Amino acid sequence: MTKNLLEQLREMTVVVADTGDIQAIEKFTPRDATTNPSLITAAAKMPEYQEIVDQTLLQAKKDAGAGASKGQIVSLAFDRLAVSFGLKILQIIPGRVSTEVDARLSYDTEATITKARELIAQYKAAGIGPERVLIKIASTWEGIKAAEILEKEGIHCNLTLLFGLHQAIACAEAGITLISPFVGRILDWYKKETGRDSYPSAEDPGVLSVTTIYNYYKKFGYKTEVMGASFRNIGEITELAGSDLLTISPGLLGELQATIGELPRKLDPAKAATLDIDKISIDKATFDKMHAADRMAYDKLDEGIKGFTKALEELETLLAERLARLEVVASH
């Protein structure tokens, strides 16, 4: 009997759950899980996770001390909430969780390093070592340089919002653990730009982008892992079967599980090794030049950072409202 697509995918690719929803992770038993500000904000709104939110706020209030302002308490709780979700997730997966650095620090190398160290220290205080955490950082030049320093300290990074080959090469040269090239957001840009409603999966610009990056890495023997992310349909996923990892939303994991059919391997290191590819070296000037020339990558990186920033601000508002409610309850 033919297996479902998810079972077959797992035979060649590490399947990762792209969600902060703990129940969804329990259902699909992925090896790893990834979160981002939008996913944490969505999970924080779900009734079943209010207890995590409340506990985090109350602990932050206690730790911030008597004279702390509401803003200081919320800021502390906000940092801890992503780790609280991460800790819950690590109880049910065997592998690693990705926790994102504040997107507002994306163009500040020093602040990114400081924040990453703080997140790792929080995990460590809860008994989780750095080998089980990936720190997610946007693939700006400043973010990549921060990650290069963090990797040397034994803090592993997942470089996200990656849309162009120049970003991927800079990450590989910096010795980053893993990258998350986005598929669906690239497709979105091309659909809007061309006015096309759809692309066949094999011609999907996001699929082609990740395929190019994967082949480049394997051709030149880079250790940085490729984890395709941001999928719009299962066709994009099946075209990337064989990628080191793929991080997939619960909805699409369910669709893969419900689909029976053959799944051929599309990405293969042995095939990549035979390709005729030119090697490029990336310094800041080259990165800036290639980034400016790649309008899609330029637009989507900027938009992605703004989107995550908006989600962070929404989460801060949500936490402030929740804190006010908890204080009212406590005063009665």
UniProtKB/Swiss-Prot annotation:
InterPro entries per UniProt: Aldolase_TIM, TAL/FSA, Transaldolase_1, Transaldolase_AS
Entry's Gene Ontology BP terms: carbohydrate metabolic process; pentose-phosphate shunt
GO cellular component, one term: cytoplasm
Keywords from the named record: Cytoplasm, Pentose shunt, Schiff base, Transferase
Enzyme class at the top of the EC tree: transferase
UniProt EC number: 2.2.1.2
Pathway: Carbohydrate degradation; pentose phosphate pathway; D-glyceraldehyde 3-phosphate and beta-D-fructose 6-phosphate from D-ribose 5-phosphate and D-xylulose 5-phosphate (non-oxidative stage): step 2/3
Top-rank taxon: Bacteria
Subcellular location as annotated: Cytoplasm
Catalytic activity: D-sedoheptulose 7-phosphate + D-glyceraldehyde 3-phosphate = D-erythrose 4-phosphate + beta-D-fructose 6-phosphate
Active site: K136
Pfam families tied to this protein: TAL_FSA
GO molecular function, one term: transaldolase activity
Coiled coil: none
Predominant cellular place of this UniProt entry's protein: cytoplasm
HAMAP family membership: Transaldolase_1
NCBIfam families, sorted: PRK12309.1, talAB
Family per record: Belongs to the transaldolase family. Type 1 subfamily.
Protein role: Transaldolase is important for the balance of metabolites in the pentose-phosphate pathway.
The protein's name in its UniProt record: Transaldolase
Lineage of the species this protein comes from: Bacteria, Bacillati, Cyanobacteriota, Cyanophyceae, Nostocales
